[in-house]
Amino acid sequence: MPQFEIPEQQWAQVVEKKGGPVVFKQIPVQKPGPDEVLINVKYSGVCHTDLHAMKGDWPLATKMPLVGGHEGAGVVVAKGELVTEVEVGDHAGIKWLNGSCLACSFCMQADEPLCPHALLSGYTVDGSFQQYAIAKAAHVAKIPKGCDLETTAPVLCAGITVYKGLKESGVRPGQCVAIVGAGGGLGSMAIQYANAMGLHAIAIDGGEEKGKNCRELGAQAYVDFTTTKDLVADVKAATPDGLGPHAVILLAVSEKPFHQAVDYVRSRGTIICIGLPAGAKFQAPVFDTVIRMITIKGSYVGNRQDTQEALDFFARGLIKVPIKTVGLSKLQEVYDLMEEGKIVGRYVVDTSK
């Protein structure tokens, strides 16, 4: 078993009060408990959820002070005495779901994210915007040794989340899926997972740069909501028979796209809600929902099996992660870009900088 020298202090980005900003400072390195591992985080993806955690604008209380982040890829450097499924030296990832009880009805039916005792990385427990992070061994993502940690990091939330959403939609090879918010970090991977699963991807977002990116990633069509005169008609026209997509994956972080989806989804189609606009409501006309037999579902991250499946697509080279890497010290600048809607693809922070 390899031995690692573990420092007493480390660099981290800490939210010291609700609303932020983050403070780049040194904090102690924690020791893992009996069922936990300590991961030397090399890279961490930056997710819109991290911004919500800093701002505290979700109806779920955050830990304070808080180290955010839940897409941490690194190396296991220590483990508790009860841990047998993970070894020191393994490549592993910290996900949104840091731990669960493994004993409730949800955990026993592979719905661990719904566990009433779930621990959430970078929200209810400290996450991956630090050089050394703790996670329950049963829930760490096992990253194949051949995978590049820098590009693996965003798969640990964005990849798993959109892959699970596509599974929940029930779409089959040859069918069409509309991806709303396709130019962002989740959307860029959703397009690729859709292609890998044999689906026709219709990308919906705003701006020429995002359109170019979506087409390069394999979207069969791109609908620009900033220039279209009739979004509903354009989305339907992008499907082979003009009847609309079989499923809609809503990754948007504003409310309006959720209302629009009912108008263009195919009859007997499924709308999957993933994006979490603060304070938003989903309003759908009851008449249309009933007579067109529309299904509306929420999809929330993924379980342990979903995690390994999503990573397998990546390990086989079917998913490319378009990233921009900056030092951990620049995290607040990434949040500022996120607030302004200027992010294309996914930002990753390097914890060594």
UniProtKB/Swiss-Prot annotation:
InterPro entries reported in the protein's UniProt record: ADH-like_C, ADH-like_N, ADH_Zn_CS, GroES-like_sf, NAD(P)-bd_dom_sf, PKS_ER
Chain sites annotated for binding NAD(+): G181, A182, G183, G184, G185, L186, G187, D205, K210, I274, G275, L276, R346
Positions annotated to bind Zn(2+) 2: C101, C104, C107, C115
GO (cellular component) term, any one: cytoplasm
Keyword Glycoprotein: no
Location(s) in or outside the cell: Cytoplasm
EC number: 1.1.1.1
Catalyzed chemical reaction(s): a primary alcohol + NAD(+) = an aldehyde + NADH + H(+); a secondary alcohol + NAD(+) = a ketone + NADH + H(+)
Listed CDD domains: CAD3 (cd08297)
Zinc found in the keyword field: yes
Binding annotation for Zn(2+) 1: C47, H70, C157
Cofactor note: Binds 2 Zn(2+) ions per subunit.
Keyword line: Cytoplasm, Metal-binding, NAD, Oxidoreductase, Zinc
Enzyme class, broadest EC rank: oxidoreductase
Cofactor: Zn(2+)
GO MF terms, alphabetically ordered: alcohol dehydrogenase (NAD+) activity; zinc ion binding
Similarity comment: family membership: Belongs to the zinc-containing alcohol dehydrogenase family.
Record's subunit section: Homotetramer.
Name of the protein in its database record: Alcohol dehydrogenase 1
Protein's gene: adh-1
